[in-house]
C-alpha cells in the first residue's frame, strides 16, 4: 500500500521505503470498494533465511504469534495475514505464496486460504521472490470471505 506506509518485507534493510503506487491487487480491492486497514507482519523477505528463525519472524516485526496459542508457530511467511484473520481482526487478507505461505497459515489458524495458480493474480507491485512460484492469494475466516476477496483480485 502506498498511503505513506513503509514497504519493508519485514527487513531493516528497506527501512523508510515508500512505494510510489499500490500493488495492482490492492488497486483492484480499492476499486471493488474494500476498506483496507493496513499491512500485517510477515517472515523477513517472505522467506526463511535460516533454520534458527521460525516462520513468521522478521527483524522489524519480531515473532508473529498464533491467535489460538501464543507458543505455536503461526506458519508461513504470510503469518500476520493468517493470524489477523484467525483472530477476527479483519474478515479477509492477502498473502503471497511461493512455498506454503498461504496454505500453512490457513491450516494453522483454522481459516480458509486460496492459493491460486501462478499468473491468475497480478504480482505487479509485490516484492518478488520467485518468478515461477510467487502468487497472490487470499485468506478469509469463511470460504465466502476468501472468495469475495479473491473475486476482486483475479485477472
Where are these regions (language model features)?
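Short, amphipathic alpha-helical segments
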Residues: 19-23, 75, 105-108, 140-143
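Gly/Ser-rich catalytic/binding loops embedded in alpha/beta enzyme cores
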Residues: 1-99, 117
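Short, solvent-exposed loop/turn segments at the edges of secondary structure
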Residues: 56, 60, 78-79, 106-109, ...
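A short core secondary-structure module
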Residues: 117-155
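Short, flexible helix/strand-to-coil boundary loops that buttress conserved ligand/catalytic motifs
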Residues: 49, 106, 150
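Mature extracellular/periplasmic domains of secretome proteins
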Residues: 85-86, 108-111, 153
Amino acid at each position: 500500500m502506498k498511503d505513506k506506509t513503509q514497504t519493508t518485507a519485514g527487513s531493516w534493510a528497506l527501512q523508510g521505503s515508500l512505494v510510489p503506487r499500490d500493488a495492482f491487487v490492492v488497486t483492484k480491492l480499492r476499486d471493488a470498494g474494500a476498506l483496507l486497514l493496513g499491512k500485517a507482519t510477515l517472515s523477513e523477505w517472505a522467506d526463511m533465511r535460516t533454520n534458527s528463525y521460525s516462520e513468521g519472524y522478521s527483524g522489524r516485526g519480531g515473532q508473529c504469534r498464533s491467535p489460538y496459542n501464543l507458543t505455536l508457530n503461526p506458519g508461513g511467511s504470510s503469518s500476520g495475514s493468517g493470524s489477523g484473520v484467525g483472530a477476527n481482526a479483519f474478515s479477509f487478507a492477502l498473502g503471497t505464496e511461493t512455498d506454503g505461505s498461504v496454505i500453512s497459515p490457513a491450516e494453522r489458524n483454522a481459516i480458509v486460504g486460496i492459493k491460486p495458480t501462478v499468473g491468475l493474480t497480478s504480482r505487479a507491485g509485490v516484492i518478488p521472490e520467485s518468478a515461477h512460484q510467487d502468487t497472490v492469494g487470499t485468506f478469509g475466516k469463511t470460504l465466502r470471505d476468501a472468495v469475495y476477496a479473491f473475486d476482486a483480485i483475479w485477472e
